[in-house]
Amino acid sequence: MRRPPLPPLPPPLRQGDRVRLVAASSALESAERLEAGIAILRSWGLDVGEPGPLVGRWWGYLAGTDSERTEDLTRQEPDGSMAPLLACVRGGWGSARLLDAGWTGLPSLASSQWLLGFSDVTSLLWSRWARGCSGGVHGPLLTTLASEPLWSQERLHNLLFGRGLAPLE
């Protein structure tokens, strides 16, 4: 039995590429751990904006209303482009609600974007895969990236920038 071909990965990131911060799940109370993750992405040469309204944005236990969180995922940059990396700031609860709340605009754009996260973000990663889009990385959230061991950070960097990955030992 032949397996269907895997969808191609998004283009590798390059220094200067834009990163959009996404709060698709639970609310983020403080920026301290988020800032540490942002600093790592900036050290890789990526253009990461300020977290702005993502910190302290609450709607019950969620990081905003369903429409606000969907907007985090689908918003275009001021020049009309899409950021090549959507980096989720935290997991928790609530991202699966977005699958019923109008996440339909993303699949046509998602094949050229990476989506990084785990925990509750897994529902978004699986939804991308089910729609034939790769580039979903079940990896650190921005609030956990700085606490990852260096080898893990380096593997993520190599994956996103299209460099080879050595086998895990």
Enumerate the predicted regions with their spans.
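Cofactor- and metal-binding active-site motifs of prokaryotic enzymes
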Residues: 64-72, 121-122, 129-131, 137
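Short acidic, glycine/serine/threonine-rich loops at helix termini
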Residues: 98-100, 127-130, 148-151
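Short, well-ordered alpha-helical microsegments
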Residues: 30, 94-96, 124-125
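Short, acidic/small-residue loops that bind anionic groups at enzyme active sites
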Residues: 104-127, 135-142
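Conserved anion/nucleotide-ligand pocket segment
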Residues: 134-169
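ATP/NTP phosphate-donor binding region
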Residues: 1-82
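N-terminal glycine-rich "phosphate-gripper" loop used for MgATP/nucleotide binding
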Residues: 87-101, 118
